[in-house]
Each structure stands twice: as C-alpha cells, then as structure tokens.
Curated annotation (Swiss-Prot):
EC number: 3.1.3.89
Name assigned to this protein: 5'-deoxynucleotidase HDDC2
Entry similarity comment: Belongs to the HDDC2 family.
InterPro entries (alphabetical): HD/PDEase_dom, HD_domain, YfbR/HDDC2
Pfam families associated with the record: HD_3
Length: 199
C-alpha cells in the first residue's frame, strides 16, 4: 500500500510540474501581434475560472464551469498554444491535444484521470450547456485581454481582428451584456484617441 501511495505521489508531482508549464506558455495570438509581455495560457484560464465563479446563471452547474475552464487548455502544456494563424487543421489540432491529455492524465489515479479527460472531452465536443457557456467565456476573456493590451500600449483599436473573430459568437445574456459594456468603453477610448491632435 505504501508503494502504491508513493507511486501516485510521484505521478501527482509530475502532473503538477507538467501543468505548471502552462505558466510559461505564452498565448500565441499575442506573440504574433508583438504584444509586450504577453499573458500565459495559465493566466487566461485563471481569469476564465473567475468569470465562471461569478456567474449568476442558476441553470448552470457553476462548479462544473470552473472545472471546465481550468481543464480546457491543459493539453497546451505539451502541444503549445496552437493559434488559427498556425494553419493547422482543426482535426490535427484535436488529435494532438487528445494525445497530450491522455499523456497528462495517465499520471493521475484512475478516478481523477477519467474526470479530467471527460471534462476536456465535454468542452471539445460542446456537449453540455456548461461547455457552451465556458466556450463563450474563452472568447470573452480574449477580447477583454485585447482591450487591456490596447489600453496598456495606448493604442485603441490595434487588436481589432481579435474582436472581429468573435463577432456573432456570444449568446449567453450575461456575456452579451459584459461584451456590450466592454465595447462601449472601447469605442469611447477610440473616439477620444481619434479626437486628440496629431492622431
């Protein structure tokens, strides 16, 4: 029994080190756009989990939403953050990430292995209301981050293509409201910038 426990401890340590690499995997979209000090995949998933935690939608299983947010990009600790600009077919991206998730979860006891893999699969297949909500959080968090980079660089509108890529993808009322508020703020910033002399 002590041996099994020691083995699972070693597996857990390897698992934690592996997912810890997400802190050092930059989000590729920002790298390609030459954003200074781009966020990590881990940064992105953390705020998504917080966004899930503060939802007021009682129809959703909030705990499950948080778990989905924390697992959805976990494979990127092995495969990296594959962006649309990488021109890797969706099926190939899925295959790589599926292999990575199998590799990652093999380090865990069977019950946890099953739970994490099934959460990842649920998100990938969008097979629940929670998965669909978290997918919208993923897109919403991205444009929120884009607006913050525009503010930090004092270049309103520079990352417009990230907004364009999410057009028509939001349907959950809370997220629609949040995005509307974000767009109002951003439009005001862009209007101010264009009104400044020399702009």
């Amino acid at each position: 029994m002590a041996l099994a426990s020691s083995g699972s401890g070693a597996g857990l340590l390897r698992f934690l080190r592996l997912v810890g690499q997400l802190k050092r995997v930059p989000r590729t979209g920002w790298v390609y756009r030459n954003v200074e000090k781009p966020e990590s995949v881990s940064d992105h998933m953390y705020r998504m989990a917080v966004m899930a935690m503060v939802t007021r939608d009682d129809r959703l299983n909030k705990d499950r939403c948080i778990r989905l947010a924390l697992v959805h990009d976990m494979a990127e600790c092995i495969v990296g953050d594959i962006a649309p600009a990488d021109n890797i077919p969706k099926e190939e991206k899925h295959r790589r990430e599926e292999e990575a998730m199998k590799q990652i979860t093999q380090l865990l006891p069977e019950d946890l292995r099953k739970e994490l893999y099934e959460l990842w699969e649920e998100y990938e297949t969008q097979s629940s209301e929670e998965a669909k909500f978290v997918k919208q959080l993923d897109q919403c968090e991205m444009i929120l981050q884009a607006s913050e980079y525009e503010d930090l660089e004092n270049k309103p509108g520079r990352l417009q293509d990230f907004y364009d890529s999410t057009a028509g993808k939001f349907s959950h009322p809370e997220i629609v409201q949040l995005v509307s508020e974000l767009e109002t703020e951003r439009n005001a910033s862009m209007a101010t910038a264009s009104a400044e002399p020399g702009s």
